[in-house]
């Protein structure tokens, strides 16, 4: 998986920079809402605003932003469905990135419904050896720790090292593997594989466009 996906996300550097500059014309002035009255910096999802990104996070810099789009999910025991998603990667100047994901169901015509779906939140860090760690909590009652590394400057792969479900949490989802990567059009793509009945199965994936940052 890693080698194939690594090739998928590789692009010409100059083309990527030029495309990013053009796309940023509609997103560069947007950011997360600010409280403005806290004694510490507000979170920012825009590298042009707020505190500077910590030097230790430079290998994860392309993720910073708010991303929105659609994906497909096929949970065990359920029919495949389409979902909408918003993902926020933000920072506050410290050596950590906050992560938040909200999803909602789409109807058969591809239109968003008012039915909320899964939520996730957590934090990412990366050390001097380019080892990424992610702490992730799932709204359906699961907590996991993932470790990984960059595949290149535009793609990052993580694998579960520890997964724990609550008493009412999912019992049919085992350890997982998750890949994030910027596609040739600079959309953020991701796919999540899970150990289901002894086999790693892709059960969630999405393609998201930048709306902030």
UniProtKB/Swiss-Prot annotation:
Taxonomically, the superkingdom here is Bacteria
Q: Which HAMAP family match?
A: nitrobindin
Q: CDD domains, per this entry?
A: lipocalin_heme-bd-THAP4-like (cd07828)
Task: Extract the ranges annotated as region (Disordered).
Answer: 17-42
Motif GXWXGXG, residue range(s) on this chain:
65-71
Signal sequence range: none
Protein name, UniProt field: Ferric nitrobindin-like protein
From which lineage does this chain's organism come? Bacteria, Bacillati, Actinomycetota, Actinomycetes, Mycobacteriales
Per the UniProt record, the source organism is Corynebacterium jeikeium (strain K411)
Which PANTHER family is this protein grouped with? PEROXYNITRITE ISOMERASE THAP4, THAP4 PROTEIN
Family, according to the entry, reads as follows: Belongs to the nitrobindin family.
